[in-house]
Amino acid sequence: MSSISLIQPDRDLFSWPQYWAACFGPAPFLPMSREEMDQLGWDSCDIILVTGDAYVDHPSFGMAICGRMLEAQGFRVGIIAQPDWSSKDDFMRLGKPNLFFGVTAGNMDSMINRYTADRRLRHDDAYTPDNVAGKRPDRATLVYTQRCKEAWKDVPVILGGIEASLRRTAHYDYWSDTVRRSVLVDSKADMLMFGNGERPLVEVAHRLAMGEPISEIRDVRNTAIIVKEALPGWSGVDSTRLDTPGKIDPIPHPYGEDLPCADNKPVAPKKQEAKAVTVQPPRPKPWEKTYVLLPSFEKVKGDKVLYAHASRILHHETNPGCARALMQKHGDRYVWINPPAIPLSTEEMDSVFALPYKRVPHPAYGNARIPAYEMIRFSVNIMRGCFGGCSFCSITEHEGRIIQSRSEDSIINEIEAIRDTVPGFTGVISDLGGPTANMYMLRCKSPRAEQTCRRLSCVYPDICPHMDTNHEPTINLYRRARDLKGIKKILIASGVRYDIAVEDPRYIKELATHHVGGYLKIAPEHTEEGPLSKMMKPGMGSYDRFKELFDTYSKQAGKEQYLIPYFISAHPGTRDEDMVNLALWLKKHRFRLDQVQNFYPSPLANSTTMYYTGKNPLAKIGYKSEDVFVPKGDKQRRLHKALLRYHDPANWPLIRQALEAMGKKHLIGSRRDCLVPAPTIEEMREARRQNRNTRPALTKHTPMATQRQTPATAKKASSTQSRPVNAGAKKRPKAAVGR
């Protein structure tokens, strides 16, 4: 079978004729002020990108890629980074754009960037100079769009970035604990681009430059728009109800129009005329020009089962080879979501990463440190996408399931550029990876299966037989990279997908021998089948095989190296017993985790659907379908997090209380098989003191005098009330009997 993919774009990313402004040439940095525009000889910007991150001219930052990509097409692109959103003034600093505003919250969702998994305010921001918090608003996409519209009403606004991408439909919002409308509806933007934006961004920019109104640009893949009805020429499937999909369009009469009755008159035969032979076009695929009507925003907000149903449909329409468009009603309008864009080819990826990035922050930041840049300045991104399909992760929804890899030459050229141009380079490449370290050049071996598959994961519950697990391209890349002059070491900091790695032990040997700096990160996430099945993660058997091979090859190389496993607490499907078993596993293997992560319900993830609805969208949805146990509430989430840090004395009282309630008091003590030690005498006394000082809960029936009492006066009042009512009164003489 041919190895050429059947998923091909209509045209190459760089095949568009350049816009006339290409005569200005590339800018040293995309301008952030009028002074820089004057130095470049620009009277205006064609496109202005507004971002919630600091502007770092590096291919790991989305706005740098989008800006340089548009610049290569001939457009003059300006950047407004982390503007003051209190007024429209900062959004007008570069003047009025000729074509459109591009708005993004940044590399991270602004709410995740601002709040912890426990909804507590963060006091830092890695994407801001000097790690200062508070430089971007909550729901930055909405705020920035409103200010752009306030500044220039007639300029189109196009949303992008991960915040907008994961909010393209009605979605559960963890921070307000409610279902919100599509961000496209709330923001009143003109268009939304989801996922990797190069292909739709270039097409829309050129079509706007040719004078086409944005209201008429409706057929671009990877975009979402607002419509009043379905696009003409599309047929629909109604999935607004559970498991009863059906055609929306009326079924045509099988015999055509009714014929008149025969009048029995003789009819002369018609003369047959010669016709030219014509080639009939191929029959359309069943998914072409087809859309799925999802349950409306109003329906999914009021019915959790319909929400889970809509989520399940959305996740099955993500393969660019066979995905159908989606349509969801919001009030009297519809959000129309076109199918995903065709992935970039290796040649296109090479061209994107070969754009003239400076690989440093904009000079306007001076000597300020940007932690996110410090982390990646010596790293190289070798691929995009992930076919793991983890339920809690948004990478697959954002970057796609098909791996988009760069060529070996392109990666080597970037390593040499880092060596020769980046200040402070010491000869160590901090990472050679991507969303996953070991998916480089891995793809489906069957082009037809790749085009039509709707599986959520290529590796769960088992690795698909069509999936190529040959790590030879990755091994060859590692060897060539570490042989470069001036390169002392190549480290792998991206997470290794160990269930794929065990299929090719050569990769594990190469990794353990040359590319681990003492510790290697992997993410089993849990040890128990209940939560693992909801996460779509492999069991511990794959972990054990990987650890055995890793330890063997490390020993052969004469190195003492360790695995650092990552785990998630409070994930849907996790019961208290599961967390206790995980804690016992950690203690048995002598792991003491410093940083632990509670499950964070981010928009669009399957795990978030489980968290909100209590249903499992990985299986058929119905009102009587499988219910998923969800650990909610601060107390239970704190307990699950505490069990991951069983060794911390601050967590012992909470763990003891939970173990006693679960009937597992035998796990409290000093024996080796115990999880936490028994309380000391001083701890028991302190617990009694705390219980003694507690006050009963107040209700509407509590007397006002008691409500206003302090603990001291309450104690005095209680001692007074314990005496007889007439204790202090003088005794009256008894009445004479028989008077």
Swiss-Prot record:
<dbReference type="GO" id="GO:0003824">
    <property type="term" value="F:catalytic activity"/>
</dbReference>
<dbReference type="GO" id="GO:0051539">
    <property type="term" value="F:4 iron, 4 sulfur cluster binding"/>
</dbReference>
<keyword id="KW-0004">4Fe-4S</keyword>
<dbReference type="InterPro" id="IPR007197">
    <property type="entry name" value="rSAM"/>
</dbReference>
<dbReference type="Pfam" id="PF04055">
    <property type="entry name" value="Radical_SAM"/>
</dbReference>
<dbReference type="InterPro" id="IPR006638">
    <property type="entry name" value="Elp3/MiaA/NifB-like_rSAM"/>
</dbReference>
<feature type="compositionally biased region" description="Basic residues">
    <location>
        <begin position="729"/>
        <end position="739"/>
    </location>
</feature>
<dbReference type="InterPro" id="IPR022946">
    <property type="entry name" value="UPF0313"/>
</dbReference>
<keyword id="KW-0949">S-adenosyl-L-methionine</keyword>
<feature type="compositionally biased region" description="Polar residues">
    <location>
        <begin position="704"/>
        <end position="724"/>
    </location>
</feature>
<keyword id="KW-0408">Iron</keyword>
<dbReference type="GO" id="GO:0005506">
    <property type="term" value="F:iron ion binding"/>
</dbReference>
<dbReference type="InterPro" id="IPR013704">
    <property type="entry name" value="UPF0313_N"/>
</dbReference>
<feature type="domain" description="Radical SAM core">
    <location>
        <begin position="372"/>
        <end position="650"/>
    </location>
</feature>
<dbReference type="Pfam" id="PF08497">
    <property type="entry name" value="Radical_SAM_N"/>
</dbReference>
<dbReference type="InterPro" id="IPR020612">
    <property type="entry name" value="Methylthiotransferase_CS"/>
</dbReference>
<feature type="binding site">
    <location>
        <position position="390"/>
    </location>
    <ligand>
        <name>[4Fe-4S] cluster</name>
    </ligand>
</feature>
<feature type="binding site">
    <location>
        <position position="386"/>
    </location>
    <ligand>
        <name>[4Fe-4S] cluster</name>
    </ligand>
</feature>
<dbReference type="InterPro" id="IPR024560">
    <property type="entry name" value="UPF0313_C"/>
</dbReference>
<keyword id="KW-0479">Metal-binding</keyword>
<feature type="binding site">
    <location>
        <position position="393"/>
    </location>
    <ligand>
        <name>[4Fe-4S] cluster</name>
    </ligand>
</feature>
<protein>
    <recommendedName>
        <fullName>UPF0313 protein YgiQ</fullName>
    </recommendedName>
</protein>
<dbReference type="Pfam" id="PF11842">
    <property type="entry name" value="DUF3362"/>
</dbReference>
<feature type="region of interest" description="Disordered">
    <location>
        <begin position="685"/>
        <end position="739"/>
    </location>
</feature>
<comment type="similarity">
    <text>Belongs to the UPF0313 family.</text>
</comment>
<keyword id="KW-0411">Iron-sulfur</keyword>
<dbReference type="InterPro" id="IPR023404">
    <property type="entry name" value="rSAM_horseshoe"/>
</dbReference>
